[in-house]
């Protein structure tokens, strides 16, 4: 049942795999060794998911900084369709 996390997989795939592992563990019907393998896999997936979230936060901060540094232009009402 244990899968190796692919470092290139997206956040949603990582989260889905982690949720699946949590469900298996919560059921309580796995043998001890398999439960330990699933738990270990879950820890790896949680770390990978955390890395993905941190990368996304960094990208957002960079984009916000670029936006804050951009000069503001005066609003012109006729820039939108329907406004004349």
UniProtKB/Swiss-Prot annotation:
Cross-referenced Gene3D superfamilies: Exonuclease VII, small subunit
InterPro entries: Exonuc_VII_S, Exonuc_VII_ssu_sf
Gene Ontology BP, a term: DNA catabolic process
Gene: xseB
Reactions this protein catalyses: Exonucleolytic cleavage in either 5'- to 3'- or 3'- to 5'-direction to yield nucleoside 5'-phosphates
Localisation per UniProt entry: Cytoplasm
Any GO MF annotation of the entry: exodeoxyribonuclease VII activity
Annotated keywords: Cytoplasm, Exonuclease, Hydrolase, Nuclease
The keyword Disulfide bond is assigned to this record: no
EC code: 3.1.11.6
SUPFAM superfamilies documented for this protein: XseB-like
HAMAP family: Exonuc_7_S
The protein's name: Exodeoxyribonuclease 7 small subunit
Principal localisation: cytoplasm
Pfam families reported in the protein's UniProt record: Exonuc_VII_S
Protein family: Belongs to the XseB family.
Coiled coil: none
Function: Bidirectionally degrades single-stranded DNA into large acid-insoluble oligonucleotides, which are then degraded further into small acid-soluble oligonucleotides.
Quaternary structure, from the entry: Heterooligomer composed of large and small subunits.
A single cellular component GO annotation: exodeoxyribonuclease VII complex
């Amino acid at each position: 049942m244990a899968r190796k996390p692919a470092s290139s997989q997206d956040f949603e795939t990582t989260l889905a795999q982690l949720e699946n592992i949590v469900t298996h563990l919560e059921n309580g019907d796995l043998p001890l060794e398999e439960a330990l393998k699933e738990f270990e896999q879950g820890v790896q997936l949680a770390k990978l998911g955390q890395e993905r979230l941190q990368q996304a936060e960094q990208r957002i901060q960079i984009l916000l900084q670029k936006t804050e540094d951009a000069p503001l232009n005066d609003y012109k009402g006729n820039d939108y369709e329907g406004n004349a």
